[in-house]
């Protein structure tokens, strides 16, 4: 009966290699991919998923799984949160929702448009885009200020009355 010596020797060699690899690396670098999902991280290489992102308003980053398309997508603000630009929002839509100058994350329309709040009829305006009906006209020829007005005529044009 002959006993093969190779399997134990191969196992011992493999263990020695695994033990030796970290010792050959620079002392300031860590072995990559050692943190699991949910653990704190600073960069992608620390995570087994190769994905280190913020997952809340807290600036601390955590290891998270990648998307089906192998993308590493950070957490984005849900609707109703204050924002400054579209990329901060999950809906990719950061708009004014009232006369208040603050902007909030908001859902897009059924046609995937991001439409901001507009001034109602009668409100003082400086440009057509400020008004709900996209029509900003002076009340009279001598009027120093313009107001939001309804569009008129068969073709609903922005014409002075």
Curated annotation (Swiss-Prot):
Pfam families: Colipase-like. Keywords: Signal. It comes from the Eukaryota. InterPro entries: Colipase. Residues 1-25 form the signal peptide. GO terms for cellular component: extracellular region. One of its GO terms (biological process) is lipid catabolic process. One of its GO terms (molecular function) is enzyme activator activity. Gene3D superfamilies: 4.10.40.50. This is Leucine-rich colipase-like protein 1.
């Amino acid at each position: 009966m002959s006993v093969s010596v190779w399997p134990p020797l191969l196992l011992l060699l493999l263990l020695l290699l695994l033990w030796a690899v970290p010792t050959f690396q620079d002392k300031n670098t860590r072995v990559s991919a050692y943190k699991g999902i949910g653990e704190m991280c600073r960069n992608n290489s620390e995570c087994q998923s190769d994905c280190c992102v913020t997952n809340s308003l807290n600036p601390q980053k955590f290891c998270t799984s990648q998307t089906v398309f192998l993308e590493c997508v950070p957490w984005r603000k849900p609707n109703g949160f204050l924002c400054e630009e579209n990329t901060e929002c999950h809906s990719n839509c950061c708009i004014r929702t009232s006369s208040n100058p603050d902007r909030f994350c908001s859902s897009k329309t059924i046609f995937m448009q991001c439409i901001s709040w507009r001034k109602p009829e009668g409100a003082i305006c400086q440009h057509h885009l400020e008004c709900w009906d996209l029509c900003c006209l002076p009340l009279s020829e001598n009027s120093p200020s313009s107001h939001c007005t309804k569009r008129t005529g068969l073709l609903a044009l922005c014409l002075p009355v």
